């Protein structure tokens, strides 16, 4: 299942041939470099490691000048990318498995790649189904009303516990809180995958993918777009 690493730019709308207005998420996926290729006899399955973006190697400013934004690449990343023939270290590294069950069911050949190859948005086509993985927006520590959608307590008749969870378990037996009880806690900033999303448009010149609907993550967040099957 080959895919591509991209950056979520935001949402917009497009119009199809019937004149219908379709909300779309725009993902910018500049050409991904193949960093490493792993075979089945090495790790048990065929996979490819892709690199997205760029990191600066060292401080690119002279004495007295402002330091440019962005973190500096670790020497390990620089050396890892150099083995694939890259002079600039990628910002993000992700692995994509190639010999998944869907390829076997459809009796499709496993694609072959070599270090240094480029993966572009042209691997997708309008109308194709994809699944997108991103990191949802972090919302910090939240109560049960926002985190789980609880209704809260009454607003009148002297009640002061408007957003409390209420009872969290019986007292006499079993005299404990059952595992899995929905409670206040950290909300968001979790890996989330949405499946069966439709590619509405491909802009090869600007490396853009227009995907119908919403995609998890904030603006400028990193997302993985994979073929559905």
State where each predicted segment sits.
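Extended basic (Lys/Arg/His-rich) segments that typically form rRNA-contacting surfaces
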Residues: 1-229
């Amino acid at each position: 299942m080959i895919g591509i690493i991209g950056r979520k730019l935001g949402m917009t709308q497009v119009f199809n041939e019937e004149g219908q207005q379709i909300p779309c998420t725009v993902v910018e996926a500049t050409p991904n470099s193949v960093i490493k290729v792993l075979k089945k006899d090495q790790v048990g399955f065929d996979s490819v490691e892709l690199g997205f973006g760029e990191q600066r190697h060292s401080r690119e400013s002279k004495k007295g000048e402002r330091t440019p934004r962005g973190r500096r690449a670790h020497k390990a990343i620089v050396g890892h990318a150099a083995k694939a023939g890259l002079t600039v270290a990628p910002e993000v590294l992700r692995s994509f498995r190639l010999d998944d069950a869907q390829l076997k069911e459809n009796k499709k050949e496993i694609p072959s790649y070599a270090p240094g190859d480029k993966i572009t948005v042209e691997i997708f086509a309008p109308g194709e189904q994809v699944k997108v993985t991103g990191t949802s927006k972090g919302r910090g520590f939240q109560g049960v009303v926002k985190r789980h959608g609880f209704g809260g307590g009454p607003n009148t008749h002297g009640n002061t516990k408007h957003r409390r969870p209420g009872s969290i378990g019986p007292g006499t037996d079993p005299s404990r809180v059952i595992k899995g009880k929905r409670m206040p806690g950290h909300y968001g900033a979790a890996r989330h995958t949405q499946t069966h999303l439709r590619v509405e448009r491909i802009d090869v010149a600007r490396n853009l993918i227009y995907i119908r609907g919403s995609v998890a993550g904030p603006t400028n967040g990193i997302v993985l777009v994979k073929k559905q099957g």
